[in-house]
Amino acid sequence: MAKKQKKLDEISKKFGDERQKALDNALKNIEKDFGKGAIMRLGERAEQKVQVMSSGSLALDIALGAGGYPKGRIIEIYGPESSGKTTVALHAVAQAQKEGGIAAFIDAEHALDPSYAAALGVNIDELLLSQPDSGEQGLEIAGKLIDSGAVDLVVVDSVAALVPRAEIDGDIGDSHVGLQARMMSQAMRKLSASINKTKTIAIFINQLREKVGVMFGNPETTPGGRALKFYASVRLDVRGNTQIKGTGDEKDTNVGKETKIKVVKNKVAPPFKEAFVEIMYGEGISKTGELIKIATDLDIIKKAGAWYSYNDEKIGQGSENAKKYLADHPEVFGEIDRQVRVRYGLIDGDDMAEAVGNKAESPVETLEEVTLDLDDAIEIEE
């Protein structure tokens, strides 16, 4: 019995060695034909954690779970008219430029306001802008930019405005059933691999439509077919809520609106989280406002009555004064922002602990400067 088992083990080992040899040869041939990295074992990848770029909003970074938009993925931002979709995308553009990247904006709606973009922090002198004549042209331009590998972020505004060339050349009233959906489906098939390879973030802004005759369920849908829904790693639903009134002389004036951003699809973190931000007219997302709210909830900023304090120091009476304090003290803003991100696990706490430790008493004492004359120096040398 033992001899039979030993023989079976030898056969299995020999057969296993032959299989491994055949697999190694196959891997070598694949790399020879298609290049190094065409196939690999998943454990061999140096970077298994998804790389992200901040969305430009702390609340949205937290809702996304990974700390921002995943690189090399497709993002869809949709919602009703004037809900803040383009504002959310422009904050991503400003963040990409802030991190030293290059951003491109495909303005299919021909409605980009350069002044508003600049107010949100976008460097309009460095922003690549295209206003295509047709949907095919816009997607082709986006594809060439992505294939170059030199662009970090591409925004398409919007999918609904990507009109197929056949529809433009035809007459109003002509039927073009499924034309835009087929165009988007082909574009997604071509772009998805290139987007992942070049680690470019592609943001597609989309509008809302309503299905006819829907009695039960949500009648809302997005134009462009289902391809974008499938290929998108993240889908954001942007909805404007209540209006924000001003203070003082502007107490009866609408100065902004509270906006809810819901992550309805997320392939890199748990979905269905929500972010509530204040979009101020002419300014964009109030970063100081969202930081105060989140830091107060985490008890990083203390609130007693109407007063806000940080590290036992009062920073303002009322939220508006606290916002002004943080805007005037960017170092305090950055310190609180880092603490919030560490608490939510968006960044590693080791770097922050090291920075805080450096502020504490140093273990190395500072030596006083001692002046020696030449005779003392010779005596020490001897």
From Swiss-Prot:
InterPro entries: AAA+_ATPase (IPR003593), DNA_recomb/repair_RecA (IPR013765), DNA_recomb/repair_RecA_CS (IPR020584), P-loop_NTPase (IPR027417), RecA-like_C (IPR049261), RecA-like_N (IPR049428), RecA_ATP-bd (IPR020588), RecA_C_sf (IPR023400)
Compartment(s) of residence: Cytoplasm
Xref: Gene3D superfamilies: P-loop containing nucleotide triphosphate hydrolases (3.40.50.300)
GO CC annotation: cytosol
Alphabetical UniProt keywords: ATP-binding, Cytoplasm, DNA damage, DNA recombination, DNA repair, DNA-binding, Nucleotide-binding, SOS response
GO MF entries: ATP binding; ATP hydrolysis activity; ATP-dependent DNA damage sensor activity; damaged DNA binding; single-stranded DNA binding
Binding site for ATP: G79, P80, E81, S82, S83, G84, K85, T86
Gene Ontology process terms (BP): DNA recombination; DNA repair; SOS response
Signal peptide: none
Keyword check for Cell cycle: no
HAMAP family noted in UniProt: RecA
Cited function: Can catalyze the hydrolysis of ATP in the presence of single-stranded DNA, the ATP-dependent uptake of single-stranded DNA by duplex DNA, and the ATP-dependent hybridization of homologous single-stranded DNAs. It interacts with LexA causing its activation and leading to its autocatalytic cleavage.
Protein name: Protein RecA
Native source species: Streptococcus sanguinis (strain SK36)
Phylogenetic classification of the source organism: Bacteria, Bacillati, Bacillota, Bacilli, Lactobacillales
